[in-house]
């Protein structure tokens, strides 16, 4: 997909983008306020309780050291105080561990709620997107966003953001404790902090584009894989296995290289920051020892300070180690929100009305359209279909036949001219009522995972079983269905895998028959069935199309010889029109197409 991070995806601008992404991610957490509040409370409680440990240990060490310095047996009287501090530490650590466990359970539930809502938002917007969106982007790439990218964001929300929250608590409390113990040592300790901040920001700015590239390469690989899986029979038939494997290797290599570059650069931060923090600890140890020898700090306080300095540095190291994960999550979030924010199909205007009591008169007047407005595929197209007429549209590939269907259904709006149904401009009626006025059978059949009954009843969920069976009989598929062990309750999987293409085509025809709309579109409706099945379908169609306005688009001219009107298209224009006999008598382009198919 083009510019994945932008569509499905300046220092200041990057910071603003990160801020906006974090705000939107936080809103997803905020939709589950109780779980979020519990997570924050447990995180704070667990960390704060654990952070009292070094202070209590330092007090115990001070008491023991004071007793030994006195060189008197009475020094042992401080043992109750030491045991008190040890017991308090044990209780605090136990409570902290219990809270940490509870926190992990809360985060599992919160994570589940967030990923469910995010996937729903993505899918909800997908249902509102115009057909043009799916014409531009690969299905596998979109699936990559819904699965991989949402999971990546979710993992970051449930783990990385929680880690950041714990880091803030730990760093703040540790710094407060260090200031209360030895302010002078804090100054020494903070010498290396600017270097840590500068280095982290530098690496972050460098790796984020790499993670964007990684997500893009993975989406491209998924799209290619899905495309090849769908076309594996064609690949084998044409002996292109080696070529496909080579193409896959190229895309796979690109994805692996992008992954390696992103991870290699992302993992630099952790070791580097850890090294800087170790230098800081070395400085604290040296100056702390000098301060102790001069009597400026007690042994227990120095021990506490060193432990707090480690606790201060530890979370920073952990955050540095997840910089790569965070950048990956930001790149994934850009793609997820890019899909959520993709421009939906324009809403019907406030004046739009329902298309009711459709008679089936369709008129196209001077229609011009191009997927790229600068390159029209339909030019100044005119058509008048009377109610109940059978209109056939024929022509070579790329002539604009299927585009006509998309315009009739208002999947796209014409750039010039107008389309009317029963004298009403289709822009003035609701899209839903317009599309329900048509039944459609496409060349590429679509069956969902469900029973045969549910597939035929799709679009008319309230249909009775008798109506479904009647439609199946009319489509000449009833006998095949009844021969199956489960009959109409047979469950189809993977777009009808296990039944023939012709049978899948017949099921979609039965679906269109059941819908019984006043207008019918057949796009290559019988191109995927054998001659005998085609004859059966044609016989059923002639009876069921009576009284309906029908548009048939086919390369096989045998299917449309009885059409009331035939439009012959070439390069986006109607070059001939009339019935079969008239067009054959003209001995023009249609006659050439016909003879090319049937002569000899």
Regions found by a protein language model. Name each.
Residues 177-191, 261, 265-334, 339-340:
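Helix-loop-helix
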Residues 34, 131-132, 150-157, 161, ...:
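An intracellular "coupling" helix at the cytosolic face of ABC transporter transmembrane type-1 domains
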Residues 18-33, 142, 146:
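A short amphipathic helical element positioned immediately N-terminal to and/or at the very start
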Residues 11-18, 41-42, 49-65, 69, ...:
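Juxtamembrane helix-loop junctions of ABC transporter transmembrane domains
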Residues 31, 35-48, 89, 159-213, ...:
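Transmembrane helices of ABC transporter permease
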Residues 36-99, 179-184, 295-299:
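Transmembrane helix-loop-helix hairpins at lipid-water interfaces of multipass membrane proteins
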Residues 341, 348-349, 355-600:
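ABC-type nucleotide-binding domain
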């Amino acid at each position: 997909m083009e510019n994945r991070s932008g569509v499905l995806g300046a220092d200041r601008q990057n910071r603003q983008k990160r801020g906006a992404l974090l705000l939107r991610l936080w809103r997803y957490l905020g939709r589950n306020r109780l779980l979020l509040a519990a997570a924050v409370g447990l995180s704070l409680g667990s960390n704060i309780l654990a952070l009292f440990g070094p202070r209590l240990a330092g007090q115990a060490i001070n008491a023991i050291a004071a007793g030994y310095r006195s060189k008197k047996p009475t020094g042992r009287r401080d043992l109750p105080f030491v045991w008190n501090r040890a017991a308090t530490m044990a209780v605090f650590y136990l409570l902290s561990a219990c809270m940490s466990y509870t926190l992990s359970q809360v985060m599992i539930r919160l994570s589940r709620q967030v990923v469910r809502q995010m996937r729903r938002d993505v899918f909800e917007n997908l249902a509102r997107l115009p057909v043009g969106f799916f014409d531009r982007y690969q299905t596998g790439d979109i699936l990559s966003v819904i699965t991989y990218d949402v999971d990546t964001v979710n993992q970051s929300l449930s783990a990385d953001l929680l880690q950041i929250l714990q880091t803030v608590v730990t760093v703040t409390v540790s710094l407060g404790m260090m200031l209360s113990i030895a302010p002078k040592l804090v100054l020494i300790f903070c010498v290396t902090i600017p270097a840590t901040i500068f280095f982290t920001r530098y690496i972050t700015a460098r790796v984020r584009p790499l993670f964007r590239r990684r997500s893009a390469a993975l989406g491209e690989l998924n799209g290619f894989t899905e495309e090849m899986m769908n076309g594996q029979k064609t690949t084998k038939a044409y002996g292109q296995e080696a070529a496909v494997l080579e193409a896959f290797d190229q895309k796979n290599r690109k994805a692996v290289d992008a992954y390696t570059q992103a991870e290699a650069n992302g993992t630099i931060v952790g070791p580097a920051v850890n090294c800087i923090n170790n230098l800081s600890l070395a400085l604290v140890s040296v100056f702390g020892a000098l301060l102790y020898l001069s009597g400026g700090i007690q042994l227990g306080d120095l021990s506490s300070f060193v432990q707090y300095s480690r606790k201060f540095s530890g979370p920073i190291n952990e955050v540095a180690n997840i910089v790569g994960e965070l950048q990956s999550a930001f790149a994934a979030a850009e793609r997820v929100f890019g899909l959520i924010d993709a421009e939906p199909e324009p809403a019907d205007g406030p004046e739009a009305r329902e298309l009711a009591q459709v008679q089936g008169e369709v008129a196209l007047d001077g229609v011009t359209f191009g997927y790229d407005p600068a390159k029209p595929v339909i030019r100044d197209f005119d058509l008048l279909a009377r109610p109940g007429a059978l209109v056939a549209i024929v022509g070579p590939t790329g002539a604009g036949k299927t585009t006509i269907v998309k315009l009739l259904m208002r999947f796209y709006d014409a750039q010039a001219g107008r389309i009317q149904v029963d004298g009403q401009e289709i822009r003035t009626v609701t899209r839903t009522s317009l599309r329900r006025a048509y039944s459609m059978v496409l060349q590429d059949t679509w069956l969902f995972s469900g029973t045969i009954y549910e597939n035929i009843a799709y679009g008319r969920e309230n249909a009775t079983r008798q109506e479904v069976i009647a439609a199946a009989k009319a489509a000449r598929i009833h006998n095949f269905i009844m021969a199956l062990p489960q009959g109409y309750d047979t469950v189809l999987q993977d777009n009808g895998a296990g039944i023939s293409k012709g049978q899948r085509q017949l099921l979609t025809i039965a679906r269109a028959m059941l819908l019984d709309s006043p207008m019918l579109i057949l796009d290559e409706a019988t191109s995927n069935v054998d001659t005998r099945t085609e004859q059966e379908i044609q016989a059923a169609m002639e009876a069921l199309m009576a009284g309906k306005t029908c548009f048939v688009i086919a390369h096989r001219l045998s299917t449309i010889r009885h059409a009331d009107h035939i439009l012959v298209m070439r390069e986006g224009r109607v070059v001939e029109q009339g019935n079969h006999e008239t067009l054959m008598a003209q001995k023009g382009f249609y006659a050439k197409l016909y003879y090319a198919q049937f002569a000899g």
